[in-house]
Amino acid sequence: MPGFLPEFTGKKNLQLLGMLQEGVTEEDIEEAMNAVGLDPKDRRHYKKYSLGMKERLGIAQAILKKPKLILLDEPTNGIDSDGIQMLEELLRRLKEAGSTIVVTSHDRDFLDAVTSQCYEMKEGSLR
């Protein structure tokens, strides 16, 4: 999970990250938060977020600038079944929009739902 400032809201954290990247607008931030099921108007500090909300904010950060390559490590960690379905749909849309998505996960059902190619790490070898 990326390092976010615990005393800031999710949106404020993304705004700070957006200042480090050229061309990130308020609309981009709100769109990314909405895409992962977070309310940009939520005034809770990051430290009050559940594990699933923290994971969603990390995914929002990853998609903020609509990158061509998205790397996600265990993105379903702490996310409930409704959130996983939302994430599956989001990843399908990003793939259709031209992004390449690399996911590491122990959740085989999730991988089957979102990947076109799947490799398994076993005894230090990729298969």
Model-predicted regions and their roles:
Residues 15, 24-41:
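Conserved ABC ATPase "signature" region
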Residues 59:
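Hydrophobic anchor residue at the start of the ABC signature
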Residues 66:
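Conserved catalytic motifs of ABC-family nucleotide-binding domains
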Residues 70-73:
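Catalytic Walker B motif of ABC-type/P-loop ATPase nucleotide-binding domains
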Residues 81-82:
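Helix N-cap at the start of a conserved alpha-helix in ABC-type nucleotide-binding domains
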Residues 105-106:
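H-loop/switch region of ABC-family ATPase nucleotide-binding domains
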